[in-house]
């Protein structure tokens, strides 16, 4: 699916909701609008700032303008320079800072207060803590007994579409993108005339847990919004895993359709919501998902 198709879907879905489509967006580069990059090292520079990300470490370049343009065009680690065979101090410190940020978002917990503030029912997998979540992924694929009973008692049965939110491997991905993706997603699904289930939050969930959820609730389509494994310096990326009529015993990974890189520096959450609505409609029409869908 190319950018033009995405924009058409966004316009169509937003129009059906009676809202104006957002202007065509481009992935935001952290270095695009910053001041001219500097080459001198500074211990006072905030390593997470736009200035630090725009820093050029190549000394005495032949074409400084080329390096400046390259540095402004990407958030990748380019133009960092070397000192002999080693990276320069500022480049190394920024690498370590980004690594620390990514590690933190894996280990952090989604606050219970945040979940309550969103009005979400909270359930959990068979995992009891973060350490077990990281070492026993198999247990993150199944709901605990209390969660099963809670879903049966408090959630809409047999929905066309069931939306699930889970922390996954990035707490920031959920808390940062939630407000921009869930309201338009729920509104778009309802506007499409679909029976939408009760959205809820699964703590310590893995992707395959959506199979059990779909089976318990009798959902035709299950949409799981889950935090992606963070990259260096990028801890806010969300993924959507959608599957048609999932079953614990028979559903395999090829049956899922994935939309990844949902964040302000990738696919904007509002655009992603419109694409997910269109995807759910096509899944219901074709009664398929993943590689079984016709393109």
Swiss-Prot record:
Query: What enzyme class is recorded for this protein?
Result: lyase
Q: How is the cofactor bound?
A: Binds between the large and small subunits.
Sorted alphabetically, the keyword list is: Bacterial microcompartment, Cobalamin, Cobalt, Lyase
Matches recorded under Gene3D superfamilies: 6.10.140.690, 6.10.250.2060, Ethanolamine ammonia-lyase light chain (EutC)
> Which reaction(s) are listed as its catalytic activity?
ethanolamine = acetaldehyde + NH4(+)
Look up the record and name the cofactor or cofactors this protein needs: adenosylcob(III)alamin
Q: According to the lineage, what is the superkingdom?
A: Bacteria
Which InterPro entries does this one have?
EutC, EutC_C
Q: What is its EC number?
A: 4.3.1.7
Can you say where in the cell this protein is located? Answer: Bacterial microcompartment
Q: Which GO terms describe its molecular function?
A: cobalamin binding; ethanolamine ammonia-lyase activity
Q: Which segments does the entry list as coiled coil? A: none
Q: In which pathway does it act?
A: Amine and polyamine degradation; ethanolamine degradation
Please state which protein family the record places this protein in. Belongs to the EutC family.
How this chain assembles, per its entry, is: The basic unit is a heterodimer which dimerizes to form tetramers. The heterotetramers trimerize; 6 large subunits form a core ring with 6 small subunits projecting outwards.
> Which HAMAP family does this entry report, sorted A to Z?
EutC (MF_00601)
Q: What does this protein do?
A: Catalyzes the deamination of various vicinal amino-alcohols to oxo compounds. Allows this organism to utilize ethanolamine as the sole source of nitrogen and carbon in the presence of external vitamin B12.
Name this polypeptide is given: Ethanolamine ammonia-lyase small subunit
> Can you name the source organism?
Shigella sonnei (strain Ss046)
**Gene that this polypeptide is encoded by:** eutC
């Amino acid at each position: 699916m190319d950018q033009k198709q995405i924009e058409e879907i966004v316009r169509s879905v937003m129009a059906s909701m009676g809202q104006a489509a957002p202007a065509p967006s481009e992935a935001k580069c952290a270095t695009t609008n910053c001041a001219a990059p500097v080459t001198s090292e500074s211990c006072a520079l905030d390593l997470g700032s736009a200035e630090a990300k725009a820093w050029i470490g190549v000394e005495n370049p032949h074409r400084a303008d080329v390096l400046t343009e390259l540095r402004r065009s990407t958030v990748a680690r380019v133009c960092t320079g070397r000192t002999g065979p080693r990276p320069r101090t500022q480049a190394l410190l920024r690498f370590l800072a980004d690594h620390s940020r990514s590690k933190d978002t894996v280990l952090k917990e989604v606050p219970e207060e945040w979940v309550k503030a969103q009005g979400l029912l909270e359930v959990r997998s068979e995992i009891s803590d973060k350490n077990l979540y990281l070492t026993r992924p198999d247990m993150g694929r199944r709901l605990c007994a209390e969660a099963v009973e809670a879903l049966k008692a408090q959630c809409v049965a047999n929905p066309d579409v069931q939306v699930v939110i889970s922390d996954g491997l990035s707490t920031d991905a959920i808390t940062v993108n939630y407000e921009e993706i869930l309201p338009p997603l729920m509104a778009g699904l309802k506007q499409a005339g679909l029976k939408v289930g009760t959205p809820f939050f699964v703590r310590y969930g893995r992707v395959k847990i959506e199979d059990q959820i779909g089976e318990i609730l009798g959902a035709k389509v299950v949409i799981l919004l889950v935090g992606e494994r963070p990259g260096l310096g990028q801890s806010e990326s969300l993924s959507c895993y959608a599957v048609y009529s999932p079953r614990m015993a028979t559903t395999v990974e090829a049956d899922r359709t994935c939309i990844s890189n949902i964040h302000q520096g990738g696919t904007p959450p509002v655009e992603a919501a419109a694409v997910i609505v269109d995807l759910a409609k096509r899944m219901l029409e074709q009664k398929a998902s993943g590689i079984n869908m016709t393109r």
